[in-house]
A protein has these predicted regions:
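Boundary/linker segments of alpha-helical solenoid repeat arrays
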Residues: 27-29, 66-70, 125-133
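Right-handed parallel beta-helix/beta-solenoid
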Residues: 1-54, 70-79, 107-111
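A generic structural motif
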Residues: 50, 63-65
Length: 212
């Protein structure tokens, strides 16, 4: 569930429910340089740069890297490219590549917001994460070798906090009634210095338009 920069229309108001999402562990065959090619093998649900998303009543299980994640577009942009402009590569068949100049699209928000994950069943038969990607290695060193059910990248926009430490409602993220889960907040914006499994700050609810 994602938005990319420089689209003519940006998506929001998404409901994903009654799905069985499982065993997505095949090698990533995306075209090199494309945004899809950066997704690690063993990823279940990814919610990227999209607002007003409800993920509920799903079974999400048996992924070797992560069952679900809520991330900014920024997590896919290599740090060396954020300041250094790189000549765009033309990919076949209109395939989208990672755009380090995404901020030039003033209508695009690279950050997820108003995401509510609730009433899902998370399971995993794997006891050890895949080590062919950086996230799997991160879980070994930071998460006791456990594969997260829900991960939040912790990359926030400048207006994430308003009136001191109050979170801007536009970027609210809530979790509820998903059973016993392994949750991680990465703090990826600060080299994982405040990496935590503490879920308390995200145990909340978000009201959505019932007509959607």
């Amino acid at each position: 569930i994602f938005n990319l920069p420089h689209l003519t229309v940006y998506g929001e108001d998404v409901k994903a429910f009654n799905n069985h999402i499982h065993d997505n562990n095949l090698k990533n065959f995306g075209v090199k340089g494309s945004i899809v090619s950066t997704v690690p093998r063993g990823s279940g649900v990814i919610i990227m740069a999209t607002k007003k998303v409800a993920l509920y009543d799903n079974i999400i299980e048996n992924h070797k890297t992560i069952n679900s994640s809520i991330v900014s577009y920024e997590i896919y942009v290599p740090p060396k490219n954020k300041k250094k402009k790189k000549k765009k590569q033309v990919l076949p068949n209109g395939i989208r590549q990672i755009e380090n100049d995404y901020e030039s699209d003033t209508q695009y928000s690279a950050y997820p917001g108003r995401v509510f994950i609730y009433n899902n069943q998370f399971k995993n038969k794997y006891w050890f994460p895949a080590l062919d990607n950086d996230f799997g290695k991160l879980w070994v060193f930071k998460n006791g070798m456990k594969i997260p059910d829900i991960a939040y990248d912790g990359i926030f926009p400048k207006d994430y906090f308003i009136e001191g430490k109050q979170i801007n409602p536009e970027y609210k993220f809530c979790i509820k009634n998903n059973g016993a889960i392994n949750f991680v907040a990465l703090d990826a914006a600060n080299d994982f210095s405040e990496f935590t499994n503490e879920v308390g700050n995200y145990e909340c609810e978000i009201e959505f338009d019932k007509s959607i």
